[in-house]
Amino acid sequence: YKAKIGYGLYIGHGGPLIINGSAIIGNNCNFSQFTTIGSLSNNAAIIEDNVYIGPQVCILENVRIGTGAMIGAGSIVTKNVEKNKVVVGNPAKAIKDVNIDVINNKWIKY
């Protein structure tokens, strides 16, 4: 397996990341240090476009993170996250909607 990673991925602070080889990561995502996208059965998470993931987040297998979602620091994501939601905690729960374009490192297509 090889993880599929879209363009514009930003990795903040150069900290360690663990990304399972079956993960799918969309365009213009922002990962903080100590992020884990794990799976025991090679069925890792699907992370859609423009997602922000805070530091020390763990995303378990068979989870889909919707476009524009934000995952708070230290969260453990065990269930799907709807698009444009902010989730925090262990297990992560939605606390509010977000409707802004937080990720500004978009590549220009020529």
Residue ranges and their predicted role:
Residues 85-106:
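Conserved beta-strand-loop-alpha-helix hinge in the C-terminal portion
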Residues 108-110:
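Alpha-helical subdomain
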